[in-house]
């Protein structure tokens, strides 16, 4: 369930990467941890999502290193 995943990630200080709007809402409601990278990509293919994650690597690393940051939104507009 979403609650189990959230609590598991929180206890281990993981970063969740998801297209699921429920995790975006949880991030707004509870903040971090865990941090959430929310993929606003609709029905994008796996290869498009992989490209987005690779192209956004610097932004993701910067986000993870910011203690006050709870959520990073990545979308297709972020692709060159």
State where each predicted segment sits.
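Acidic, PIN/NYN-like endoribonuclease modules and their adjacent C-terminal/linker elements
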Residues: 3-6, 25-80
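Acidic, metal-binding active-site segment of PIN/NYN-like and related structure-specific nucleases
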Residues: 9-27
């Amino acid at each position: 369930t979403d609650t189990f995943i959230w609590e598991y990630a929180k206890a281990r200080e993981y970063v969740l990467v998801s297209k699921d709007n429920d995790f975006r809402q949880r991030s707004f409601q509870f903040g971090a941890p865990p941090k959430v990278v929310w993929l606003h990509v609709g029905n994008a293919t796996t290869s498009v999502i992989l490209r987005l994650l690779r192209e956004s690597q610097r932004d993701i690393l910067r986000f993870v290193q910011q203690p006050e940051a709870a959520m990073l939104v990545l979308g297709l507009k972020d692709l060159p």
